[in-house]
Amino acid sequence: MRRCAVLHRLRCKFYVFVVSLFVVVKLVYLKISMDNSIYIEPYGVTRRSLKPQPLDGINCTAIYDLEPVEIGKSLEMRRKKIVEVDDGRIASFTADCKSYIEQRRYNEVLVTDEECNFPIAYSLVVHKNSAMVERILRAIYAPQNIYCIHYDQKSTKDFIAAMKNLESCFPNVFIASKIESVQYAHITRLKADLNCLSDLLSSEVKWKYVINLCGQDFPLKSNYELVTELRKLNGANMLETSRPSKVKKQRFQFRYQLKDVSYEYQKMPVKTSIAKDPPPHNIEMFVGSAYFVLSRDFVTYVMNNQLAKDFLQWSVDTYSPDEHFWASMARVPGVPGELARSEPDVSDLKSRTRLVKWNYLEERLYPKCTGTHRRSVCIYGAAELRWLLEDGHWFANKFDPKVDPVIIKCLEEKLEEKQLQQCLRRVS
């Protein structure tokens, strides 16, 4: 009996020792993990963000000047685990509109009279990472502009809550009245933009041009610069529109069906053997990208003209219709801002709508990517700051704070500097 009691006490002590050892090891692991992590947070989201941040020590002017020591700092940060605020925290942060607006300094945005008289509309089709969406909104925000946000039916509750909070905090930000379940390369992606365009036309803001963005875009121009460039268009549209290759023609010469797939996208259009009829109204097919800068008159035409409606219906079972719908409509004779069919191709380099760096064209058409690649597209790194700002494009894709938080911070800083300088210059 005594022997059993001794064994029981030994077992208890051993159990306590093992549990204590596990807790110590876990705490050491957490400390090492935290020491090797960088937290990217808008000011005031959590208590941690009230303390000095690693990014505070980055000199963006030195990054712009490609000073080796400062570029080295950014590379050192990228070796660490980069942690961004989750959607729940952003939803909580944006729930108190007064505090949120003050801490993110929306109330300090400066604009000129020229900008006030030239409002811009935005269609933001997003589905995740509310922290990045908020940073995009802050970078393009001006009180005279108007912003439509289309989230995805599949987005998380916290993400949707954060988007709805943004709507609540600003009179010129709203959620699209109709929300799609967006599928990759499917008509739903095009419809998401069309839903926003319809709502934007119904708004009281008499915007001149509309620009569409996704959650991995970022501006390269200040609002003042955008207004200056948009005025130069003089009613024309700006987007890619080129004659399709044989491979691209396959996208609309055959019918596609949305099917379950075993990889990343889960569902996507799959080609069938059923040939499609030619497009209605003898529309000549051109291809481009999903990105556009469109005049109000052109959008009004697309939303109301039977030709455009018929073409949209014809495009329903094509592959990635957003990449040929706009490119083809821009060439239709008689549309506002028409680009004649006989005019040369407008490539992504000629159109200033979006700067995308493809890995197979690097070191031929543009410098090598200093970030990383995802599906052949460069996710920009800090060393590309100067090139991005001097290239001449208006927006770029792709950015990811978990890949390189420095490039986004420095773009924010440089664009704010430019807007301030331009406003002060107009006043003086």
From Swiss-Prot:
<dbReference type="GO" id="GO:0006486">
    <property type="term" value="P:protein glycosylation"/>
</dbReference>
<feature type="topological domain" description="Cytoplasmic">
    <location>
        <begin position="1"/>
        <end position="12"/>
    </location>
</feature>
<keyword id="KW-1015">Disulfide bond</keyword>
<feature type="transmembrane region" description="Helical; Signal-anchor for type II membrane protein">
    <location>
        <begin position="13"/>
        <end position="30"/>
    </location>
</feature>
<keyword id="KW-0328">Glycosyltransferase</keyword>
<feature type="disulfide bond">
    <location>
        <begin position="60"/>
        <end position="214"/>
    </location>
</feature>
<keyword id="KW-0325">Glycoprotein</keyword>
<comment type="function">
    <text>Glycosyltransferase that mediates core 2 O-glycan branching, an important step in mucin-type biosynthesis.</text>
</comment>
<dbReference type="GO" id="GO:0003829">
    <property type="term" value="F:beta-1,3-galactosyl-O-glycosyl-glycoprotein beta-1,6-N-acetylglucosaminyltransferase activity"/>
</dbReference>
<comment type="pathway">
    <text>Protein modification; protein glycosylation.</text>
</comment>
<keyword id="KW-0812">Transmembrane</keyword>
<feature type="glycosylation site" description="N-linked (GlcNAc...) asparagine">
    <location>
        <position position="59"/>
    </location>
</feature>
<keyword id="KW-1133">Transmembrane helix</keyword>
<feature type="disulfide bond">
    <location>
        <begin position="169"/>
        <end position="196"/>
    </location>
</feature>
<keyword id="KW-0333">Golgi apparatus</keyword>
<feature type="disulfide bond">
    <location>
        <begin position="148"/>
        <end position="369"/>
    </location>
</feature>
<dbReference type="Pfam" id="PF02485">
    <property type="entry name" value="Branch"/>
</dbReference>
<keyword id="KW-0808">Transferase</keyword>
<feature type="disulfide bond">
    <location>
        <begin position="378"/>
        <end position="410"/>
    </location>
</feature>
<dbReference type="GO" id="GO:0008375">
    <property type="term" value="F:acetylglucosaminyltransferase activity"/>
</dbReference>
<keyword id="KW-0472">Membrane</keyword>
<dbReference type="GO" id="GO:0000139">
    <property type="term" value="C:Golgi membrane"/>
</dbReference>
<comment type="similarity">
    <text>Belongs to the glycosyltransferase 14 family.</text>
</comment>
<keyword id="KW-0735">Signal-anchor</keyword>
<feature type="topological domain" description="Lumenal">
    <location>
        <begin position="31"/>
        <end position="428"/>
    </location>
</feature>
<dbReference type="InterPro" id="IPR003406">
    <property type="entry name" value="Glyco_trans_14"/>
</dbReference>
<protein>
    <recommendedName>
        <fullName>Beta-1,3-galactosyl-O-glycosyl-glycoprotein beta-1,6-N-acetylglucosaminyltransferase 4</fullName>
        <ecNumber>2.4.1.102</ecNumber>
    </recommendedName>
</protein>
